[in-house]
Amino acid sequence: MLLEYHTYHPINLRSGILRRNLSASDSDRLNQHVGGYRLEVVEPLRKIRMVLEETEGLAADLTWEGSFEVVQEQRHVMRQGTRVTLDAQRFAQVGTWSGSLSVDGEEIAVSPDTWVGTRDRSWGIRPVGEAEPAGRPADFDGMWWLYVPMRFEDYAIVVIMQEDGDGIRTLNDCTRVWKDGRV
């Protein structure tokens, strides 16, 4: 299952060969409640709850809890000439899910011993979403992106790498965080 919380709010659920998509939308990014879909911060940087009231045969009451402290990834800056095209940073965290899902009335138990997940939150300037400023648009020559958060018994590792279209590494970060918060 993929849960995303952006300006748009898609929920994607796949069961066997069936895939269901549900979107709720509101342009107010501070509003964590759209229709029957809401996100609650139970404990900052540790625990969140996602509730979907029955909508088109889907319902959920899920709690995500971080297994480790958040990992703050290094700042990522890309330029094209003197123009900054990307200046962003994020935090990532691995954890587990608990609660229940309902698909067309069938209840699915979600247990933290088998439902592992990750979350991240990024901020900054990115070449997506908003219109290009006036002037010549930046050329895009492609990129390679690797983002791998991993959870183990005693620690988590978050790997993030990016190369531009010429194969030049523009981001190279790997962080291990232990259960006691050591990095």
What are these regions (language model features)?
Residues 1-183:
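Structured soluble/peripheral alpha/beta segments that form catalytic or ligand/cofactor-binding pockets
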